[in-house]
């Protein structure tokens, strides 16, 4: 079953449909893989093996009975542990929710269940999705399958590592400032942030409600497109969910067709804009070399490469780190030790609600979460709201206008996804600003609500680790992004002789023991 787990989700779906393999066989193969390698990676926080095999058996029975099934029926999936799943733990990577069992499903989980995709389990993340390395999880860091001494990105490092290590063919993540795309870049996977509102946020534990977006993690562009079609669409339970009053579209239809069209590698007439401000100083040389090589591939495929300038992008990081913590400080107020989750009682003194809340939050939240709550509360405080939060929202408007101007010159925009390849554990923990700079290229898309995709862009010369390339499209033009992404993927694989993950080191070998021990 070793080769089975390395197939794309689309290829697995085809084998399932033809009867060549069963869903139980596929699901068991991934569970066996998790048992073999996750002790090294720590990608999963909770396994859902019994239910996954039950759903797989139901799919096999339905298929044998000739029932009509979704294309991805029987294809397993992993879920970031920020998305609630009924009857299963949802921790958000935090001690404050340790042991909490969700009484309901997120909308995306309802859709996954309706498609009859077996849920393998819940994946690790930075606490409440606050981080760029998955080092801030209360349950230990996830390790990068390419080098166990390095980070897998964040906040969704668990989902990216699981897909990269062949523990799952697909996963769900959330992206507030790059938490799907940046892990994709450093693990050699595909990560997509859909148009804001294109996928329901109902049931995703909110960090920053105006920025958060659920999206797919996969090994191919087509797989991501197929998954986004499953989870996308209007949801009346999410007040920010998009719906077009004319045609009812949200930007989550026709994606797989667009990816299949792009796979022929022809981009004749497509204008691709290189964002001047997303490169240069601070970007690793090997990342930029691979980026320039990809531009030449795109030019050779008929695309017109133009340079565009978005001056306000230079302020995006600052605006984000005022807006995001402000919204997070409000969203996390519900974790008070009274309603649900951890309750820590004060050791002495009067037993008031305020003192229970203080003791609970002090014990339940990690340092990065506390840092952002304090920053957000300060930015929203009387006398400072206009100077900080209000000013950041004005810069957000400028960023949106720069996107509009750029898309008047180009059909899609392109940049490196992250400035560097994966860094060593502990390398940036003492310097929050250095950590935050990992998201400098991904944050603008969240501030503007436009879709973004990261796909593998080869291995950097300095360290032989994956780098990523990012595509950005106008809002609701997700299909165009998938078309260009699939074309670039086809061009890359023709150059590389196959998917980049084929070059990843083997896991589960005794030779990795030293590397694992070094990260503990």
Curated annotation (Swiss-Prot):
Entry keywords, A to Z: ATP-binding, Ligase, Nucleotide-binding, Protein biosynthesis
Residues in coiled coil: none
EC number(s) per entry: 6.3.5.7
Lineage: superkingdom: Bacteria
GO MF annotation, one: ATP binding
One example of a Gene Ontology biological process annotation: translation
One Pfam family named in its UniProt record: Amidase
GO cellular component terms, A-Z: glutamyl-tRNA(Gln) amidotransferase complex
InterPro entries in UniProt: Amidase (IPR000120), Amidase_CS (IPR020556), Amidase_dom (IPR023631), AS_sf (IPR036928), GatA (IPR004412)
Catalytic site: 80, 155, 179
UniProt catalytic activity: L-glutamyl-tRNA(Gln) + L-glutamine + ATP + H2O = L-glutaminyl-tRNA(Gln) + L-glutamate + ADP + phosphate + H(+)
Keyword Ribosomal protein (UniProt): no
Protein role: Allows the formation of correctly charged Gln-tRNA(Gln) through the transamidation of misacylated Glu-tRNA(Gln) in organisms which lack glutaminyl-tRNA synthetase. The reaction takes place in the presence of glutamine and ATP through an activated gamma-phospho-Glu-tRNA(Gln).
HAMAP family cross-referenced by the UniProt entry: GatA
Similarity annotation: Belongs to the amidase family. GatA subfamily.
PANTHER family hit by this protein: GLUTAMYL-TRNA(GLN) AMIDOTRANSFERASE SUBUNIT A, TRANSAMIDASE
Oligomeric form and interacting partners: Heterotrimer of A, B and C subunits.
Protein's name in the database: Glutamyl-tRNA(Gln) amidotransferase subunit A
Provenance organism: Renibacterium salmoninarum (strain ATCC 33209 / DSM 20767 / JCM 11484 / NBRC 15589 / NCIMB 2235)
Name of encoding gene: gatA
